Amino acid sequence: MSWIHSDKDFVLDSHCDTPGMLLEGIDLGKRQKRGHVDFVRAREGGVDGMFFAIYSPPEFTEEEAVAHAVRLISKCYDAVDGNSDVAAFAFSPEQAFENKRKGLISVFLGMENGTPIQNDLAYLHLYHRFGIRYLTLCHNRHNQICDSCMPMEPEWGGLSPFGKEVVAECNRLGIMLDCSHASDETFYDLLKYSSTPVIASHSSCRALCSHPRNMSDIMLRDLASAGGVVQINFYPKF
């Protein structure tokens, strides 16, 4: 892979679900037989950084989601601290490029599903202090922030009133907004209400695979026109 990646490039995996396996006690510093990512294979593949997904299952209550998110964040810190010879946290682009100069893989944190925010922006502030740098607003179920792409009947018709507050506060804090898993209406609300570009951290093309998790050509063009980017998802069903 080295011939593809120059020293000027920064190769980023924008959504890595491997942290869920940290709860089982795996060591990312060693080659794993399960999963797709560990620090050994990331280095071999020329990956400069990855966003570890702090994922809370949609069936969790808000209280359960908070406890799960904090536990998973703690495990991510343990994993990076225990492999400081190969990895380091990055909370800004500058830190990421500095890590690359040092030969270290950057680990970013992104929260997948906003349920752990509950209905209190103080939780969002706390997660930002913990290192969260993007927020995937929902998963495969509506929540207190917005409508998901999966249930057919909408609850909010896009962002909820609290969801609009979350968008504004993420803009202020510097947390990127991720439209993956969101309904089409939520996507367009994000473009309308966010003052910063929106990302799709793990979405694919609806024209190639007609699945509600994917984005239409029009949505992809509108995202690009608003300065956003999409990272293609390699999940087979999409």
Question: What residue ranges belong to the model's regions?
Answer:
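Catalytic pocket-lining loop regions of alpha/beta-barrel enzymes
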Residues: P161-F238
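N-terminal hydrophobic targeting/anchoring segments and the immediately downstream early-domain regions
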Residues: M1-W156, S210-F238
